């Protein structure tokens, strides 16, 4: 038995809700973005992203699973030939929801749900370089030797990744100089305290 969804049901019956989500997903894949109520957009988001995941697989079984929900053959073709390959390097997060305010008349909150853009070559190179140098991506996935080598190759090929690597080196250099200066000051202060204590003990 399927787990019931919390909150009010869209439409009136379960069958009406399934048809409503299928039609909204078809319109989303056909036009790239639609404007609807905020409640429908939030319910549509996981529904549509699951269909995009099937499209990324690209096999016959995945196509048949999608055609259970999307009945328009042209939209299914677009989903498997254009939308699915677009997100080959993105693990989830294929849509975004933008709130638009309330609608005149019934004051219902409106929102626009749309497909996000694909990752560019520069963004992929920057992501690989950041994983290799162990910054904000290191908590999620630590780079292997192959990933580090690939990031270095991408940095040599991509000017964006090279700029990121240069900026990282510039940020690390002042930190090392500051630590060296602090260590020198600490040692000098220790020597002065020793010199001050020495004569006092000899007088006593």
Curated annotation (Swiss-Prot):
**Quaternary structure, from the entry:** Part of the 50S ribosomal subunit. Contacts protein L32.
> Any idea which UniProt keywords this protein has?
Ribonucleoprotein, Ribosomal protein
Query: Which organism encodes this protein?
Result: Frankia alni (strain DSM 45986 / CECT 9034 / ACN14a)
Q: What is this protein called?
A: Large ribosomal subunit protein bL17
The record's InterPro entries line, in alphabetical order, gives: Ribosomal_bL17, Ribosomal_bL17_CS, Ribosomal_bL17_sf
Q: Which family does it belong to?
A: Belongs to the bacterial ribosomal protein bL17 family.
**Signal peptide feature range:** none
- Residue ranges annotated as compositionally biased, kind Low complexity, are 156-191
Which GO terms fall under biological process for this protein?
Answer: translation
Composition bias type Acidic residues, residue spans: 192-204
- The region called Disordered is annotated at 124-204
Which Gene Ontology molecular function entries are recorded, alphabetically? Answer: structural constituent of ribosome
Which residue stretches does the UniProt record annotate as biased composition, category Basic and acidic residues?
Answer: 128-142
Matching entries from Pfam families are given as:
Ribosomal_L17 (PF01196)
* Native organism taxonomy: Bacteria, Bacillati, Actinomycetota, Actinomycetes, Frankiales
Gene Ontology, cellular component aspect: cytosolic large ribosomal subunit
* Cited HAMAP family: Ribosomal_bL17 (MF_01368)
Would the keyword Ribosomal protein turn up in this protein's UniProt record?
Answer: yes
């Amino acid at each position: 038995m399927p787990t019931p969804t919390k909150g009010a049901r869209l439409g009136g019956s379960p069958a009406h809700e399934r048809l409503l989500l299928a039609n909204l997903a078809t319109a989303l894949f056909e036009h790239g973005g639609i404007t609807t109520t905020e409640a429908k957009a939030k319910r549509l988001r996981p529904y549509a992203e699951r269909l995009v995941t099937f499209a990324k697989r690209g096999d016959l079984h995945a196509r048949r699973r999608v055609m259970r929900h999307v009945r328009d053959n042209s939209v299914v073709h677009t989903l498997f030939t254009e939308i699915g390959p677009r997100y080959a390097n993105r693990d989830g997060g294929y849509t975004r929801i933008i709130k638009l305010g309330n609608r005149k008349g019934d004051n219902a909150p409106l929102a626009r749900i749309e497909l996000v853009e694909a990752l560019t070559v520069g963004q992929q190179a920057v992501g690989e370089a950041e994983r290799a140098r162990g910054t904000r991506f290191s908590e999620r996935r630590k780079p292997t030797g192959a990933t580090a080598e690939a990031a270095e190759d991408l940095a040599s090929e991509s000017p964006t990744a090279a700029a990121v690597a240069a900026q990282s080196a510039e940020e690390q250099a002042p930190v090392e100089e500051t630590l060296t200066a602090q260590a020198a000051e600490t040692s000098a202060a220790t020597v002065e305290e020793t010199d001050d204590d020495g004569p006092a003990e000899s007088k006593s």
